[in-house]
Design a protein with these regions (language model features):
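Short, positively charged, Gly/Tyr-enriched micro-motifs
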Residues: 32-104, 112-113, 160-165, 209-219, ...
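Acidic, His- and aromatic-enriched active-site or binding-groove loops in soluble protein domains
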Residues: 245-257
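Short amphipathic alpha-helical "interface-anchor" segments enriched in bulky aromatics
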Residues: 120-124, 323-354
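Electropositive, glycine- and tryptophan-enriched low-complexity nucleic-acid-binding patches
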Residues: 60, 78-82, 143-222, 299-312
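Active-site-proximal, Lys/Arg-enriched surface segment
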Residues: 86-176
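Extended, non-catalytic structural segments that build the interaction scaffolds
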Residues: 52, 311-334
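A short, flexible helix-boundary coil/loop motif
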Residues: 1-44, 56, 72, 171-189, ...
Length: 458
């Protein structure tokens, strides 16, 4: 039994490695790496190094066992660390280019009436056991309310409701130098990617949002709305992002944030008190249109909080959008929470390597995001029959032509058999009645009754 289990595990590993190899070939990841400045002058190729690190969680190994002490790996740990610590490598461009190719693949499978969205959120990048990690700071975990050592991982994802693609991220430290536990350890050329990453790590969060959205839209990735939590749905942020894309976000209850409503400047709580509420246990309590200080009109939708005896408020810049659609579309924001959970628990985000170099953290986080893209791609091609290509569409057109008629014919045939069993049955009248129904339906779709004759089973 032990030999059988070992053999099955080996077969599973080979199968996964084959799928990963197909993924790298299909989307030409080696070419993407080369065009983004990630090259090697000697030794093994960048693609083989990246693919080896990429594969680790899928074969049940961590970085130490899979790369450092693994005798089967044809290169040493120094080559892997050299790849991760490169200061001129544009990992952000790698992620955007791969995301653009996957978007083109998913976009063909998405109906036009389904709203694609961008989702903005942040999560903690936990390095609680570290002391000398570059730009290390203390960040507040929103889920526990405690402070821990690490970074804030600001992420933006694309979702069509079925698949979620992480497209860009910023690893953020504290803007206050006094609050950082470890300072910058490298002297860098200000033109290189490493310097720009460190500079943005010490900037405020809201500064990055517009740049991230513009980068994503500039590579041809389209979305109808951007979804944000209450931490980001501030009037200044809304006014900035609304120049590029419509917004749906949760409103923060704060006496410091004001909207212009009914000619007066007031906070969200004051607006809610003055609105007429719907009776009973309605899910949507009220809705109204307010104005920001820059003159832009926004729609406020107040909904019942099912977990507390309280209310929540959603904001959208699309004032023509129905209240129910605002709630439905905002529900897609949950996709990024699933992504964070999956990345931390299964894809080894912030756990696989213990590098103290900031560039290595950026490179490894990018590879983790690429792993999630691979999983999303595999799930889509295995669950969505439209990935079979043109054959699917031809089969679908045939099914659309005959499925209703054939179903109606079978139902009426069963009804005739049932009437025969009752004893009171007029063959001529019933046959004429059913034939009239079938012929009328056939004329509507341009078929004949011979098309419904079932072939005998062989």
């Amino acid at each position: 039994m032990e030999h059988i289990s070992i053999a099955s595990v080996s077969q599973d590993s080979l199968h996964v490695q084959g799928q990963i190899d197909d993924f790298f070939n299909s989307f030409r990841i080696g070419t993407i790496l080369h065009r983004c400045g990630i090259t090697k002058r000697h030794g093994h190729s960048v693609r083989s190094l990246t693919q080896a690190i990429f594969t680790l969680p899928f074969i049940g190994k961590n970085f130490f066992r899979g790369m450092v002490i693994n005798p089967d790996v044809p290169f040493g740990k120094d080559a892997a660390y050299q790849l991760l610590k490169g200061t001129t490598y544009n990992w952000r461009k790698v992620l955007l280019r791969l995301g653009g190719l996957l978007f083109n693949f998913f976009d063909r499978l998405t109906n036009d009436d389904r709203e694609a969205v961008l989702i903005i959120d942040d999560s903690t990048y936990d390095r609680s056991r570290s002391k000398m990690v570059e730009l290390l700071t203390r960040v507040r975990d929103h889920t526990t309310g405690r402070f821990l050592k690490g970074f804030r991982l600001l992420t933006i994802c694309w979702s069509d409701g079925a698949s979620c693609l992480p497209l860009d991220f910023s690893l953020l430290s504290s803007a206050d130098e006094k609050k950082r536990l470890c300072s910058n350890q490298k002297i860098l050329d200000k033109r290189c990617c490493a310097y720009r990453r460190r500079k943005e790590a010490t900037a405020k969060t809201t500064v990055h949002l517009e740049a991230m959205v513009k980068r994503i839209l500039s590579v041809g990735i389209s979305a109808k709305y951007v979804l944000m939590d209450s931490w980001f749905t501030l009037p200044s942020t809304v006014a900035c992002l609304a120049q590029h894309i419509e917004i749906i976000g949760m409103v923060r209850k704060s006496p410091m944030i004001h909207y212009i409503w009914d000619g007066y400047s007031m906070d969200i709580m004051a607006i809610y008190r003055r609105l007429k509420k719907r009776r009973g246990r309605a899910r949507i309590l009220a809705s109204t249109v307010a104005r920001l200080k820059d003159g832009r009109y926004v729609k406020l939708v107040f909904v019942r909080d099912r977990h507390k005896k309280d209310w929540l408020a959603l904001l959208t810049t699309d004032i023509q959008l129905a209240d129910e659609d605002v709630i439905r579309i905002y529900g897609k924001r949950w996709d990024i929470e699933v992504f964070f959970k999956m990345s931390k628990q299964h894809l080894k985000l912030a756990k696989e390597i213990q590098c103290r170099d900031f560039d290595a953290l950026i490179a490894h986080t990018t590879i983790v995001f690429m792993r999630y893209m691979f999983i999303v791609y595999q799930c889509r091609i295995e669950s969505d029959h439209r990935t079979f290509g043109e054959l699917f569409y031809r089969c679908c057109s045939e099914v659309d032509d005959i499925s209703f008629i054939e179903s109606l014919y079978r139902v009426l045939s069963l009804a005739v058999d049932q009437l025969r069993t009752t004893g009171s049955y007029c063959e001529k009248t019933a046959s004429a009645f059913f034939d009239a129904i079938i012929n009328t339906a056939l004329q509507c779709v341009g078929l004949s009754k011979n098309d419904l004759v079932m072939k005998p089973e062989s």
